[in-house]
Amino acid sequence: MAHGRRVERVASMIRREMSELLVNGVRDERVNQGMVSITNVVVAGDLQHCKVSVSIFGSESEQDQAMAGLRSAAPYLRGELSRRLNMRRTPELVFHHDKGLAQGVEVLGLLSKLEEERQERGPVPDGSEEM
């Protein structure tokens, strides 16, 4: 079992190389049509499995197609990582669609809408805020 520092270092190297491969290595149009970015890489302590979280900009169908493209490109990506990182055993890649960015934008939109409604109502007469 690898130590924490090694696991973190391997995750960092995988993230860097995966970012490069997504831009220059993957030729699958499903992946290239949406804007795909890696948000997080988590490597298991035994260095056998790697969870790659990706954020995908585009419509729902484009996001689904990009995820399908990433899953089909996983063996190619793993092989490229093996060549580039020179590891004895390259972790198996599992892709996860990270919807946190889209949810964050949605929350910010709701907060803006609430602020607009509050400004339309004007100040509360007694000086205290409503709950």
UniProtKB/Swiss-Prot annotation:
Its main location: cytoplasm. One of its GO terms (biological process) is maturation of SSU-rRNA. Keywords: Cytoplasm, Ribosome biogenesis. This is Ribosome-binding factor A. PANTHER family: RIBOSOME-BINDING FACTOR A, CHLOROPLASTIC-RELATED (PTHR33515:SF1). InterPro entries: KH_dom-like_a/b, RbfA, RbfA_dom_sf, Ribosome-bd_factorA_CS. Belongs to the RbfA family. It is found in: Cytoplasm. SUPFAM superfamilies: Ribosome-binding factor A, RbfA. It comes from the Bacteria. Coiled coil: none annotated. Monomer. Binds 30S ribosomal subunits, but not 50S ribosomal subunits or 70S ribosomes. One of its GO terms (molecular function) is ribosomal small subunit binding. HAMAP family: RbfA. GO terms for cellular component: cytosol. One of several proteins that assist in the late maturation steps of the functional core of the 30S ribosomal subunit. Associates with free 30S ribosomal subunits (but not with 30S subunits that are part of 70S ribosomes or polysomes). Required for efficient processing of 16S rRNA. May interact with the 5'-terminal helix region of 16S rRNA. It comes from Synechococcus sp. (strain RCC307). PROSITE patterns: RBFA.
